[in-house]
């Protein structure tokens, strides 16, 4: 089983294109939904999400285990624990958290064979073979990480993070809409849907801002859910819909201001470099002999990367920040939030994959220290551990 354990959603080879929300969700009627059980919800108003991770670290094991239990023991997606597990973890996960993950996998779920790795390592395999060097730009939920991967292994000194992700954009949109239109502060799930449907990355922010002031060419209307004809709402087409009885949000510069904070965090008074400056810093922090290769293999992944205009804006702003003699090339898959999972599928089919894994028998004998050694390359002395 392959598990891309994202901070917003879990992707697995057992669930196809479906995503499992990595959260406990409480409805307005106090019903609690665990992970994929959210599909049973009939009223998406005022949903409250409790997530196991914050700022790129797993902080709540009770929630994470509840979501995993629901996934592993579900009759439709459940797994045979005699099988193997490939699991992703967040960049720069604390060693004790990694050790706890290993313990849960073997002692709680009893998997026979297991490999844990950072998601960026799997992205390096997503093209069908392992790239010698690539730079993974993961625009995720809690934050955006830039990670150099050299010969299939993360180069930790080059990892950089921008503390802006899908969550930040949704919260800003929620506050803006509540100030300008209706009070939507309790409607995180619906506003997140609005963001996904109408927002885009501007290629020239100042120009679009001026255009939005002078004309309505960028304005769209979003019909809010009435829970009779729609549970999540939709973008209004005036030619097809009679809006006289609809409660709608008119969105103009909000459409591109929310994504702009990733490229210019100072908009929300966040004292950090923007995404493209952060990418340039990551490349500069990598070994000199690999910098050109990293520039030519930039892989963009994560849910925020689905926003229209993301790739072209990144290329436009990044080009002046890297040496002119470097060839720059970016890749964005049709489903960038599933690129990591695709890389995992390629890796598990490699003849040497089992050599990367720790078996339950080995874990029972040597414990979590063997996992740390095999997954992260730290020194391990079998004689010392078995003594």
Curated annotation (Swiss-Prot):
Compartments it resides in: Cytoplasm; Cytoplasm, Cytoskeleton; Nucleus
CDD domains on file: ASKHA_NBD_Arp6
A GO cellular component entry from the record: Swr1 complex
Molecular function GO terms recorded: nucleosome binding
Keywords for the protein's UniProt record, in alphabetical order: Activator, Chromatin regulator, Cytoplasm, Cytoskeleton, Nucleus, Transcription, Transcription regulation
Matches recorded under InterPro entries: Actin (IPR004000), ATPase_NBD (IPR043129)
Single GO biological process annotation from the record: chromatin remodeling
Gene3D superfamilies per record: 3.30.420.40, Actin, Chain A, domain 4
Subunit and partners: Component of the SWR1 chromatin remodeling complex.
Family statement drawn from the similarity comment of this UniProt entry: Belongs to the actin family. ARP6 subfamily.
Function summary: Component of the SWR1 complex which mediates the ATP-dependent exchange of histone H2A for the H2A variant HZT1 leading to transcriptional regulation of selected genes by chromatin remodeling. Involved in chromosome stability.
Stated name of the protein: Actin-like protein ARP6
Gene: ARP6
């Amino acid at each position: 089983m392959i598990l891309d354990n994202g901070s917003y959603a879990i992707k697995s080879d057992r669930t196809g294109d479906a995503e499992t929300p990595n959260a406990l969700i409480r409805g307005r009627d106090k019903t609690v939904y665990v992970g994929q059980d959210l599909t049973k919800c009939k009223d998406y108003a005022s949903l409250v999400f409790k997530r196991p991770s914050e700022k790129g670290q797993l902080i709540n094991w009770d929630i994470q285990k509840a979501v995993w239990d629901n996934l592993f023991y579900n009759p439709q997606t459940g797994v045979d624990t005699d099988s193997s597990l490939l699991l992703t973890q967040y960049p720069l996960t604390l060693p004790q958290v990694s050790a706890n993950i290993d313990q849960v996998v073997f002692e709680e779920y009893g998997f026979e064979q297991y490999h844990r790795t950072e998601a960026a390592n799997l992205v390096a395999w997503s093209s069908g073979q392992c790239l010698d060097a690539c730079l993974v730009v993961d625009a995720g939920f809690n934050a955006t990480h830039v990670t150099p991967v050299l010969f299939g292994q993360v180069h930790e000194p080059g990892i950089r993070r921008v503390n802006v992700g899908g969550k930040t954009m949704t919260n800003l949109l929620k506050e803006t809409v509540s100030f300008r239109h209706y009070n939507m502060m309790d409607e995180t799930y619906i506003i997140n849907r609005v963001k996904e449907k109408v927002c885009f990355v501007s290629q020239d922010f100042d120009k679009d801002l001026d255009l939005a002031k002078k004309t309505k060419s960028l304005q769209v209307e979003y019909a809010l859910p009435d829970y009779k004809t729609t549970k999540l709402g939709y973008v209004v087409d005036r030619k097809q819909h009679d809006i006289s009885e609809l409660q709608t949000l008119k969105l103009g510069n909000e459409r591109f201001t929310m994504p702009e904070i990733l490229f210019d965090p100072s908009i929300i008074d966040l004292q950090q470099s923007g995404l493209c400056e952060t990418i340039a810093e990551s490349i500069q922090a990598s070994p000199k002999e690999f910098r050109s290769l990293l520039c030519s293999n930039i892989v963009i992944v994560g849910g925020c990367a689905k926003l229209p205009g993301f790739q072209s804006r990144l290329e436009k702003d990044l080009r002046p920040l890297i040496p002119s003699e470097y060839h720059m090339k970016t890749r964005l898959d049709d489903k960038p939030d599933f690129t990591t999972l695709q890389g995992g599928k390629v890796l598990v089919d490699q003849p040497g994959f089992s050599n990367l894994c720790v078996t339950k028998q080995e874990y029972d004998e040597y414990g979590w220290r063997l996992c740390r050694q095999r997954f992260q390359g730290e020194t391990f002395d079998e004689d010392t551990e078995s003594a």
